Curated annotation (Swiss-Prot):
<feature type="glycosylation site" description="N-linked (GlcNAc...) asparagine">
    <location>
        <position position="55"/>
    </location>
</feature>
<keyword id="KW-0472">Membrane</keyword>
<dbReference type="InterPro" id="IPR050932">
    <property type="entry name" value="TM2D1-3-like"/>
</dbReference>
<protein>
    <recommendedName>
        <fullName>TM2 domain-containing protein C41D11.9</fullName>
    </recommendedName>
</protein>
<dbReference type="InterPro" id="IPR007829">
    <property type="entry name" value="TM2"/>
</dbReference>
<keyword id="KW-1133">Transmembrane helix</keyword>
<dbReference type="GO" id="GO:0016020">
    <property type="term" value="C:membrane"/>
</dbReference>
<feature type="topological domain" description="Extracellular">
    <location>
        <begin position="21"/>
        <end position="136"/>
    </location>
</feature>
<keyword id="KW-0812">Transmembrane</keyword>
<keyword id="KW-0325">Glycoprotein</keyword>
<comment type="similarity">
    <text>Belongs to the TM2 family.</text>
</comment>
<feature type="glycosylation site" description="N-linked (GlcNAc...) asparagine">
    <location>
        <position position="127"/>
    </location>
</feature>
<dbReference type="Pfam" id="PF05154">
    <property type="entry name" value="TM2"/>
</dbReference>
<feature type="glycosylation site" description="N-linked (GlcNAc...) asparagine">
    <location>
        <position position="93"/>
    </location>
</feature>
<feature type="transmembrane region" description="Helical">
    <location>
        <begin position="164"/>
        <end position="184"/>
    </location>
</feature>
<feature type="signal peptide">
    <location>
        <begin position="1"/>
        <end position="20"/>
    </location>
</feature>
<feature type="topological domain" description="Extracellular">
    <location>
        <begin position="185"/>
        <end position="195"/>
    </location>
</feature>
Length: 195
């Protein structure tokens, strides 16, 4: 019985320590600049797209408490913001030929007031490019394909050396490469899209 009581006392003294440690991490990771450091109360009859007056107070854990009343804001969730009102992490794992949508993490600008979480996921078009031109690759493949110039240009140096020493597979490898580049199968070494 005594060991159960001691266990509960130890557990009770340990739990606030865990909470204070995780609370400290949250405060350091929170952005307290501008509207990002505010918690705003939108009216209950708020209709999406309407301009409303909101009352805002500083978030818990942000230094320098601030209270702003009757601030004009558009009634919308953060994920409904216009593209200029948020930033997203760049998409770097796209395929070369498709323009599919990719899920990425976005966050609202600190000057924007919106409902819900300021960090959200959004589907954006996948169009990451590192500057390789499809036209230049096609020209290199047709004109100097037998020497592997197209593959050297794309950063595929291992297969380019093989193509160089076999004279483009005596022309066969060159013809196949022209078709593969035309349909977008051969892509730059980093997986980016052509410009």
């Amino acid at each position: 019985m005594l060991h159960k009581i001691l266990f509960l006392i130890c557990l009770a003294s340990f739990i606030p320590t865990i909470g204070s440690i995780s609370g400290t991490k949250d405060v350091k990771s929170k952005n307290c600049d501008g509207s990002a450091g505010l918690t705003c109360t939108f009216p209950g009859d708020c209709r999406i797209g309407d301009t409303v007056k909101v009352n805002c107070t500083s978030r818990k854990g942000c230094p320098n408490p601030v209270s702003r009343n009757n601030v004009e804001a558009v009634c919308r969730f953060c994920w409904q913001l216009l593209p200029g009102d948020y930033d997203c992490e760049p998409a770097t794992n796209c395929s070369t030929s498709s323009t599919k949508l990719l899920v990425t993490k976005c966050s609202a600008h600190s000057s924007v007031i919106c409902m819900g979480q300021r960090n959200f996921y959004k589907r954006i078009p996948c169009n990451w490019s590192s500057g390789y031109s499809w036209t230049k690759t096609m020209i290199l493949s047709v004109v100097l394909g037998g020497f592997g110039a197209d593959r050297f240009y794309l950063g595929l140096w291992k297969s380019a050396i093989g193509k160089l020493f076999s004279f483009g597979g005596l022309g066969v490898w060159t013809l196949v490469d022209v078709v593969l580049i035309a349909v977008g199968y051969i892509k730059p070494y980093d997986g980016s899209m052509y410009i």
